[in-house]
Amino acid sequence: MTAPLHEAHPTGSGRRLPDTQQGMRRRNLARVMHAVRAEGPLSRAAVASHIGLTRAAVSTLVDELIRSGLLEELGPERPGRVGRPGSALAVSGRGPAGIGAEVGVDHLAVCAVDLRGDVRARAVRHGTNRGRPPGPVIRELAALVRQVVAEAEREGLWPAGLAVAVPGLVARDARTVVRAPNLDWHDTDLGALLPAELPLTVDNEANFGGLAELWLGEPTARDFLHVSAEIGIGAAVVVDGRLLRGTRGFAGELGHVPVRPDGPECPCGGRGCLEQYAGEEAVLRAAGLEPGGDRVGLLADHAARGDEDVRRALHDAGTALGIALTGAVNLLDPETVVLGGALSGLAPWLLPSLEDELARRTAGPPCAVAVSRWGPQGPLLGAAHSVVRAVLDDPSSVAGRS
C-alpha cells in the first residue's frame, strides 16, 4: 500500500486519534492545551468558551492536565475580563520538554524546548562532520543530548522525546538516513546509535525548518515553500498547513533539481544541480574565496563591503535559485517562498535576481518571497518543537511520566 503523501512521522504533529470515547477525551485534552497555550492565561470558563465545551467538562479535563503537570494555576485571572474572576490557567514551565538535535556538515547542536515554546538549554559543537563515520559523530551528538537533558532536568523538565535533523534523505521509519551525500552517509540507522530511552524521530533538516516556519512564523502561513541551504539545498513543501512528504518521504530535494543539464558533476551523481550554483561552497568558489569557518558570515561581510566578485556570485546564485524555484511555483502555486537557513543571511544580495527570475518565468502573478526570522536555527527549533507538538496534540501520551 502506498503511504499517504502527507503522512506525519510518528512523533510529529498530525497523528490521528481513534474515533472512540477515549479518543474523543484525548482530543479534548489537546484542545484545552492548545487553547491555553495560544490564548492563556485563561480561566476554565474562558477555555470552555474557546473550545465550545461545557464548563463542567472543561473542569474535568483541566484537573487531569494539572495532575499530569502540563497545566498550572496562577491565581485570579488577569484584569479586563467581565464577571467573577476565575483561577487563571497557564501551560506549565516544568514537566515535558522537546529535545531537538541537528547534525550539520560542520556542526552539531542540541536544545531543549518546554511546552510554552521557550528554549531552556542549548549546546553546540563546531567542527567538520564531512567524511567522518556516523558512529563517532553520533556519539558526540549523544553526549550533547545528555548535557542538554541534564541542564533541562535541573530546571524541572524531563525529555518527552528526541528529534534529529539531518542533511539528507530519511526513510519512512523516521530513524534511518538513506543518503546524506555531503556527509557521505548511506543507510545509517541513527536509532541504533542514540540513547534508547528517548522516543526518536529523524527527519530532513529542510522539513524541520519548514515546520518551524509553520508553527512559529506567521499564523496565516498555510501554503508555502521553505528553502534552506548549507552546503546542500533543501525545501519543505507545506500545503494547507501540512508537510508534503511524497511516497518515499523524499519530497523537497530542490538542491538536486538541474538548472544546467551540462553543468558540473554533483555528489548525488547528477550534473548541473542547483547545489553546484547556489550552495555555500559553490558561491565561495565562484567568488574566489576559500571555504572554511563561517561561510555565510564571510560572504555577507564581503558583499556588504562592496566586493564585486562576491556580489556577482550571489547574483548568479539567486538566478539559479529562481530557475529551480520556478518549476516548483508553477507546479504547486504556493502563497509564499520563504528563504531560511544560510539563505536568510544572504537574502539582500540573492533576492533581486531570484525575484526577477521568478517574475519572468512563472505562469501566474509573481510569487511573494519572504525571509525566515529563524534563519539557521530553524531546523533545530523545528525538531524540538515537533516533540512539543506531539505532547500538545496528545497530552495523555505522557500521562504518568512526570
Per-region residue spans from a language model:
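General beta-strand structural signal in soluble alpha/beta enzymes
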Residues: 73-75, 199-204, 237
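ATP-binding/phosphotransfer module of carbohydrate and carboxylate kinases, centering on a glycine-rich
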Residues: 1-124, 130-151, 155-158, 262, ...
